[in-house]
Amino acid sequence: MSIRTLNPGPLWNHFADLNEVPRPSKKEEKVIAFIKEFGEGLDLKTYVDKAGNVIISKPATAGMENKKTVILQSHLDMVPQKNADTEFDFETEGIRSYVDGEWVTAEGTTLGADNGIGVA
């Protein structure tokens, strides 16, 4: 079963989209571009700093401008691990995730949920 069928829908759809983007540690260029395009697509202030951090800023809701700012943070990369019998290129392929009973898992590789679910 596809993870896109899970609830809450927006979370799992974002996670599925993210897992389509190769993002092994030390090779985050593709996922940085993906997240940057995501923020820009929502017309949010979006930039990438010298370290490769993607910062997306959303203005306060009307009437909440004087409230404290909330910051959500998570890392974009994932540790590229696969089963010995699995052919997979973490630099060019997206993670093939699916639902197995009560678990979300991946076909022969790590799922990328640390910290991909935080990014989603």
Q: Over which residues does each language-model region extend?
A:
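Structural signal for hydrophobic packing residues in well-ordered secondary-structure cores
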Residues: A16-N19, G39, D43, P80
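A non-catalytic alpha/beta surface segment that caps or lines the substrate-entry region
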Residues: P24-K68
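Active-site metal-coordination/substrate-binding segment of hydrolases
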Residues: M64-A120
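Predominant activation on well-ordered alpha-helical scaffold segments within soluble catalytic domains
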Residues: W12, A16, A33-K36, V119-A120
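N-terminal capping segment at the start of a domain
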Residues: S2-K26
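Generic hydrophobic, helix-prone segments enriched in Leu/Val/Ile
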Residues: F15-L18, K26, I56, M78, ...
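Conserved short-loop catalytic and cofactor-binding motifs
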Residues: N19, R23, Y47, T110
